[in-house]
Amino acid sequence: MPAVPLESRLLQALAPWREAGGWCVAFSGGLDSTVLLHLLAQLARSEALPALSALHVHHGLQAAADGWPAHCQAVCRSLGIPLRVERVQVAVGGSIEQAARDARYRAFQANLGEGQVLLTAQHLDDQAETLLFRLLRGAGLRGLAAMPASRPLGGGRLCRPLLGVSRAELEAYAQAHRLDWVEDPSNQDPRFSRNYLRREIMPRLASHWPQAVAGMARCAAHLREAEDLLAELAAIDLRACRQPSELDWPDWLDLPRIALEPLRRLSAARQRNLLRAWLGQLTRLPDSDHWAGWESLRDAGDDADPIWRLESGELRRGAGRIWWLPADWRAAAGPFVWERPAHPLLLPGNGRLALLGEVPAGPLRVDYRRGGEVLALAGRGRRDLKRLLNEAGVPSFLRGRLPLLFRADELLAVANIPGLDSPREGGWRLSWSPPTNDPGLS
């Protein structure tokens, strides 16, 4: 059977995005992205493709790279494709490879318009190297699934249309069309792990197992399918854990949360799968050996206040739910004199407070819980606020941010908590609107 031309394979890979708002090639000037850009430029002569453009990210990590933007400009000019050059700062410390990648993808996202597709030139050999590299690092299924053919990126999508094409095929195309490209000297440095795999390990594997690269890439595709199935299962379980209940909190408490009991009924593996899907959008998660914090939070008694601290925040329990609190969640500062109680009061870092109904006589002040407060209730007399909040099922992490209304030293109301947010005689209610643009409450 004759080989399918690269042009046809590329068109097939990009078929789902033919109606995109534009195709932008991540153009380093190296062999792989040069071939991808040239292929697309040739196809655009005979096919109705989305508008083509290119983006070169300049890391400034080595002197040789300073000439690459000019090379990329010359290539794009010859092909009639507009080019943007984005200069980035790479964070120092840690892995320079990872820091450069992070800076590069931030630039990709910042330059990708709504509905546009960013095209990168990773190929079959890259996929095999990624699988082996992550296997050596003890990655889980998601990591071993290697690079997806496409994924969301900002308001658009990132696509890798050459994952089924070998490095040798790209080299043959470049030579046949007499293309010029730049060589990154750092790609020859075996101190970088990926370079060591590419230059030392992969050739030895291929010399003994000629189909090693194709086999590893095929394995990654199987693992990707398994990972997709687990993602579907996580979505099903998440829906079950997001069903409203009588213990659910109203919309004003806009924090990510899921119900605890449906989660507890799942197997341990399904619990971890669900939490990875949910929390993976919010924070970096630990490896599988460091989930004892989740087990402690899950299994703690009802009167406990367990916390699982993660990189970007923490998980807490309360009101039959598990809640995500970002790292900048904090108790609010007070007190504040409410000089014009007929008008809403802006609370620094904590939204807005309003009195609905007839305004009570003053002077009024707003503060937060400090301990020892009591509240007079109709038919119940004076009751300890801590006990009242326990009865109302108010999560412990929320109590330091609930506004309290005082007249002199008398506690009049607790915002938003039914039965506690208005006086014994009625006539008004204390309403709190948390800041929806605050990461701590959105």
Curated annotation (Swiss-Prot):
The superkingdom listed in its UniProt entry is Bacteria
Its Gene Ontology cellular component terms are: cytoplasm
Q: Name one GO biological process term.
A: tRNA modification
User: Which InterPro entries does the record associate with it?
Assistant: Lysidine-tRNA-synth_C, Rossmann-like_a/b/a_fold, TilS/TtcA_N, tRNA_Ile_lys_synt, tRNA_Ile_lys_synt_N, tRNA_Ile_lys_synt_subst-bd
Q: Which UniProt keywords are given for this protein, alphabetically ordered?
A: ATP-binding, Cytoplasm, Ligase, Nucleotide-binding, tRNA processing
Listed binding positions for ATP are S28, G29, G30, L31, D32, S33
PANTHER family reported for this sequence: TRNA(ILE)-LYSIDINE SYNTHASE-RELATED
Instruction: Name the job this protein performs.
Output: Ligates lysine onto the cytidine present at position 34 of the AUA codon-specific tRNA(Ile) that contains the anticodon CAU, in an ATP-dependent manner. Cytidine is converted to lysidine, thus changing the amino acid specificity of the tRNA from methionine to isoleucine.
Write out the similarity annotation.
Belongs to the tRNA(Ile)-lysidine synthase family.
Q: What is this protein called?
A: tRNA(Ile)-lysidine synthase
Tell me the lineage of the source organism.
Answer: Bacteria, Pseudomonadati, Pseudomonadota, Gammaproteobacteria, Pseudomonadales
